[in-house]
Amino acid sequence: MSVRVVVTGAAGLVGQNLVLMLKELGYEKVVAIDKHAGNLEVLRGLASGVETVVADLAVPGSWEGLFDLESVVVVLHAQITGKHPQEFVRNNIEATKRLLEAIHARGARFIVHVSSSVVVSVAHDDYTRTKEAQEKLVAESELPHCILRPTLMFGWFDPKHLGWLSRFMEKTPVFPIPGDGKFMRQPLYIRDFCRALVWAIEHQPDRQVYDVVGAQRIDYVDIIRLIRKVKGLHTRIVHIPTGLFRALLRTYALFSSRPPFTADQLDALSAGDDFSGVDTEAVFGFRQTPFEEAVRESYCDPRYSRVLVER
């Protein structure tokens, strides 16, 4: 493929999977930008021939010269969890402002911005507020762009969310669940979402917004049971009152600089969102992978399921 693709936040869950897919599809000019040098090293080992750039987009630097009128820029960088509001402001808002300024100065053929379903959710936390602001920056930038809003994603190279829970389940005889665990989720398989991103890179639908929602509605507790099943584990699931669970999370956060699961995420889990999205087959040309098959591929694949990136 002749198009040059520049990916920000390239060493995270979406970025690792997207770059790997782009290389599988024959894209030769891929630039991966991330501030996490160790995770970029993992990416370099997975996808040979990718140009990797260690850079913090909130700070001026040589990275600002990486854009040109022949490039499609995929905006993935995001602060998803954290203890301090300023982390979200810095990495979701300030970094995006500087990125858009660099693109204005140098040019780009198109921007594919990955937002989040939280911008249309009932949640009100630092992640939601700053993702709303980030999306608005892109939408008002006057640059050619489209926006995709995925629901909770899972798959290879996931240091957070279901990936972390999957690994935690392997290490403990007891797995705690808040309340009855019947919090409806619409998880989206990362390889399916990357197929939508590739479509956007190739079709460049200007000023369009796509809500990309996992096809299966499933309760959180049933997701945990399915992960346990496909991995052949015998971990006991124990239900803990939601209030106590929240208090335990807040206490844990006092002693951890990077808590894997926060009280804000628990509130988002129990918010009761029910998202509607585009028909992925009609719009992007693919039918979503059946959920159990996707979970099995995510956590049992002999090539990639054991590859870890840092949070």
Q: Can you describe what each PLM-predicted range is?
A:
Residues 5-25:
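N-terminal Rossmann NAD(P)H-binding glycine-rich loop of SDR-like oxidoreductase domains
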